[in-house]
Regions:
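Short glycine/threonine-rich loop-to-helix capping motif typified by GTGT followed
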Residues: 385, 411-415
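Helical hairpin unit composed of two closely spaced alpha helices linked by a short loop
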Residues: 376-397, 402, 407
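N-terminal localization/anchoring segments of enzymes in phospholipid and broader phosphate metabolism
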Residues: 1-357, 361, 365, 405, ...
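Thr-Gly-centered strand-to-loop micro-motif
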Residues: 373-374, 401, 431, 450-451
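A C-terminal junction/extension of Radical SAM enzymes
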Residues: 421, 428-429
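Catalytic-core elements of nucleic-acid end-processing and repair enzymes
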Residues: 439
């Protein structure tokens, strides 16, 4: 045990070293670009002309893009005021969505996978008839992301991540055919070791096991030999978008999804990653609040497709699936529940912000109340307007954010949004026991979401995300009850941020808000 602990500490230290190395490499790339241009003094006029032309082209490109003004303005200001630095940063992290070749690869895989999902028009008609406002949102998701609405699915909500982990371990042990796991962060520590022990047993029983994680999300948690270690015990493992020094147009796009699929029958998703802090095994930021859901039935097909998309698109050199049908299976399952559920995914590979549009649609459809829980609150003008307009219509709009931050700078930006919201009637609560990482929304006792999508630019525009839209089911009731309990542990900071702020504080917050879209 002591040896394992020492080994774990060594791996964590190596991961932190690699994180520091990655940050240093990015800074060196920016410095290199600036230095090259600056030192060519004898060509100052040519360089100046070239920089101005390039800056102008980039500004025009930004202006003509489909991005919101909140996304465009910071880059335009940065490029115009500091052309060399602005152009360098934009080339490194501002080009959202990867290369044309990469987008083609994702589109090709989607063209094979997504049509394998059922159309479920009868189910869509039923939800439109029973709950018209939820039906409209379900229709939007299906028309713009291919993911259909389902019934014949039992839904279990977990108000604590550790409950989700326990349920996952139980279901993983029952696997007979395959296990798919996709997570933003995996920590080679206690929580993962529990999962790994079960996975090893299932591999020995002939079960196919695949594990997929984001390189930057896990960089401080595991060492580079993790993939080799998994492969040595029979677990197929791939890494999303590994950091490599050099110009990477895909660097800012991370896989933030959290999915487990067992035999195509049972699926899990939610806000938690597979690291100790999510289950309160460690407490770096006080108590950790996270949530998740378990699906059993027809809707698991969508989670399977979401996993297979990323697994097969991550590398054109890897050996990929040629027959998806053996994983997308329709079982003769009879659910006890009759509610509606719609797992969906969002991608920076297209110009459709499904995650944000679902949230805004729910806000616009709200008649009585609309509540959110999010770890970060860094939102566009469009979402700000929707929240404020709902509050001005008399809708009870509430947002729960952490009382203890994981990133103080980001927390200050989150708080900079409070005043603009509360002055129009939105109520803001901070969860005093610690850090709430859950990403949930609920409207009028009839529909809710639970998944990976934060109320911030990175989730809404840059990351690969997934969520679960639910309506007319017990999970919606349980989410509401959980939010009420959570608000009982919060401090209501609405009145505190209604009052005016000092000029110094306003200036600082305006500066941070200006560049919020770059984060």
């Amino acid at each position: 045990m002591k040896q394992d602990t020492l080994e774990g500490k060594t791996k964590t230290k190596n991961g932190i070293k690699r994180l520091c190395f990655s940050i240093i490499c990015i800074l060196l790339e920016v410095i290199f670009i600036i230095t090259i241009v600056t030192r060519l003094n004898e060509y100052a006029e040519i360089i100046n002309l070239f920089t101005r032309i390039l800056s102008g082209i980039l500004v025009l490109r930004l202006y003509a893009s489909d991005k919101t003004s909140s996304m465009k303005m910071p880059w335009v200001i940065l490029i115009l005021i500091f052309p060399i630095m602005g152009v360098g940063l934009y080339l490194l992290i501002g080009l959202n969505g990867g290369t044309h070749k990469m987008r083609e690869r994702y589109a090709e895989i989607d063209s094979k996978l997504l049509p394998m999902l059922p159309d479920n028009q009868e189910c869509l008609s039923r939800i439109k008839e029973k709950i018209p406002k939820a039906g409209n949102i379900a229709s939007y998701i299906q028309r713009n992301s291919w993911y259909p609405i389902y019934q014949n699915t039992d839904i279990k909500y977990f108000d604590e991540a550790v409950k989700g982990l326990e349920a996952q371990l139980e279901e993983l042990a029952k696997a007979q055919k395959f296990i798919f796991m996709e997570y933003h962060a995996i920590e080679d520590a206690e929580a993962w070791h529990k999962i790994q022990d079960v996975l090893e047993e299932r591999v020995k029983a002939g079960v196919e096991v695949r594990v997929f994680y984001d390189d930057m999300g896990s960089i401080g948690f595991i060492n580079t030999d993790f993939v080799k270690k998994m492969e040595s015990i029979g677990i197929h493992c791939r890494v999303f978008n590994p950091f490599v020094p050099g110009l990477n147009l895909f660097l800012n796009n991370r896989d933030h999804r959290k999915i487990t699929v067992i035999d195509g029958k049972v699926g899990f998703t939610g806000g938690y990653n597979l690291a100790n802090e999510y289950f309160n095994y460690t407490h770096p930021y006080g108590q950790w609040k996270d949530t998740g859901i378990r699906l059993e039935g027809d809707a698991v097909q969508s989670l399977t497709v979401t996993f297979l998309e990323m697994w097969n698109a991550v590398s054109e050199k890897a050996t990929n699936d040629t027959d998806f049908s053996k994983y997308i299976i329709h079982y003769d399952y009879k659910a006890q529940q009759t509610g509606f559920v719609q797992p969906y995914a969002d991608s920076p590979m297209d110009n459709e912000q499904v995650g944000e549009e679902v949230y805004i649609s729910m806000i616009n459809k709200a008649e009585n109340y609309c509540w959110f829980m999010t770890p970060y609150l860094i939102i566009t003008d469009e979402m700000t307007h929707a929240l404020c307009l709902a509050a001005k219509r008399g809708v009870d709009v509430r947002i729960i954010t952490p009382g203890i931050p994981d990133k103080k700078f980001i927390y200050n930006i989150t708080r900079s949004f409070y005043h603009g919201l509360v002055k129009h009637g939105v109520r803001v609560y901070e969860w005093t026991p610690g850090f709430c990482h859950a990403k949930m929304s609920i409207v009028d006792d009839c529909m809710a979401t639970c998944g990976t999508i934060n109320l911030d630019y990175r989730s809404l525009y840059h990351h690969f995300e997934n969520g679960c839209f639910m309506a007319d089911c017990q999970a919606v009731v349980e989410i509401k009850n959980d939010l009420i309990r959570t608000m009982g542990e919060c401090r209501d900071v609405t009145d505190q941020y209604c009052t005016g702020r000092s000029a110094y504080l306003r200036l600082g917050q305006l500066f941070m808000r200006l560049f919020a879209g770059l984060l």
